[in-house]
Amino acid sequence: MLDSFYNKNFFNRDTIGYLCDTIEQEQFQIEENKNQAEDKKKTRTLLVHRNKIKHIIKDLESFIVWVNDRHFGYDLYPFNDHDICLYNIYDPHGEYGYHVDTSRSDVWDMKLTVLVNLSTEKFTGGQFMIYNGVEYEVPELSEPGSVLIIKSFLNHKVQPILSGQRKTLTLFGCGPKIK
């Protein structure tokens, strides 16, 4: 059974630039680090309203549905204009410790975590790691434009950035709680 699925160079350099510019010009709300994430998450995160970028990410959403249908098989809700995406900016020393992605809702949960490397400059460090009985790196996410889809319940982290700036967009494939 697959833990992850990736597509290298899903977005080209021009689309990455356009997506970053669109997000950064909108001046979205900055996520407050609360609860246990406060000690783990050392990054700036903008809460991006999907409806502001849907014209740019529509092919990505179609790809997510295709990957889920063929490789994961979760019951997912359709993407919605009210969904929130996360735009993470990691500067030097920025990192995000081991965590899982989940909801506090009684009726829905996160099934898939989708990460897109939107870095517009070179960076060192920032390796994406998964722990599933053993720790391993997912080097495919290091390439700008690459997309990584993982099961949301997997422990994952971003190693500290040593130099440069790492940018990612995170979407979540959500669906009903398992009953």
Where are these regions (language model features)?
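Catalytic core of non-heme Fe(II) oxygenases with the double-stranded beta-helix
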Residues: 65-179
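Non-heme Fe(II)/2-oxoglutarate
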Residues: 1-79
